Swiss-Prot record:
Disulfide bonds: none annotated. GO terms for molecular function: small ribosomal subunit rRNA binding; structural constituent of ribosome. NCBIfam families: S6 (TIGR00166). SUPFAM superfamilies: Ribosomal protein S6. This is Small ribosomal subunit protein bS6. The lineage of its organism: Bacteria, Pseudomonadati, Pseudomonadota, Alphaproteobacteria, Rickettsiales. Binds together with bS18 to 16S ribosomal RNA. Belongs to the bacterial ribosomal protein bS6 family. GO terms for cellular component: cytosolic small ribosomal subunit. Transmembrane segments: none annotated. Keywords: Ribonucleoprotein, Ribosomal protein, RNA-binding, rRNA-binding. InterPro entries: Ribosomal_bS6, Ribosomal_bS6_sf, Ribosomal_S6_plastid/chlpt, Transl_elong_EF1B/ribsomal_bS6. It comes from Anaplasma phagocytophilum (strain HZ). The gene is rpsF. GO terms for biological process: translation.
C-alpha cells in the first residue's frame, strides 16, 4: 500500500477538545476503510494570509497515511463534506519522514 501525506486546516473556532474529536473521527474513518494512520502532527493555530470562509486563522494538522488509492479517494470525498475542514491537500509520498517535521521544529529543540 502506498503512503500519503494529508494536511488539513480546521476552523479557528474549534476548541482543543473538538479538534481532537475531529482528528479521532478522521482516524476512525481511515481504519474503517482499511487504511492506517502512521503519523499525526498538530502544527498549531496559525494566521492566514487572506481569510478563508470568514476565518483569519486555522488549526493546521498533518497526517501520514498508508492506504489503497480507492480508500484514499473515498476518504478525501468524505473530508470534503466536513464543514470543520476548511482546506486539505493530499500527496502520494514514497516514505514517511522520520522525526518531527520542520513545522514542529527540529528533534534537537
Amino acid at each position: 500500500m502506498p503512503f500519503y501525506e494529508f494536511a488539513f486546516i480546521a476552523q479557528q473556532g474549534l476548541t482543543q477538545y473538538e479538534l481532537e474529536g475531529l482528528s479521532k473521527g478522521l482516524t476512525a474513518l481511515l481504519v474503517k476503510m482499511g487504511a492506517e494512520l502512521v503519523k499525526y502532527e498538530y502544527w498549531g493555530l496559525l494566521d492566514f494570509v487572506y481569510s478563508i470562509a470568514k476565518n483569519n486563522k486555522g488549526h493546521y494538522c498533518m497526517m501520514y497515511i498508508r492506504a489503497e488509492p480507492a480508500a484514499m479517494d473515498e476518504f478525501k470525498r468524505k473530508v470534503k463534506l466536513n464543514e470543520d475542514v476548511l482546506r486539505f491537500l493530499c500527496l502520494k509520498v514514497d516514505k514517511v519522514p522520520e522525526g518531527r517535521s520542520a513545522m514542529m521544529g527540529s528533534d534537537q529543540d
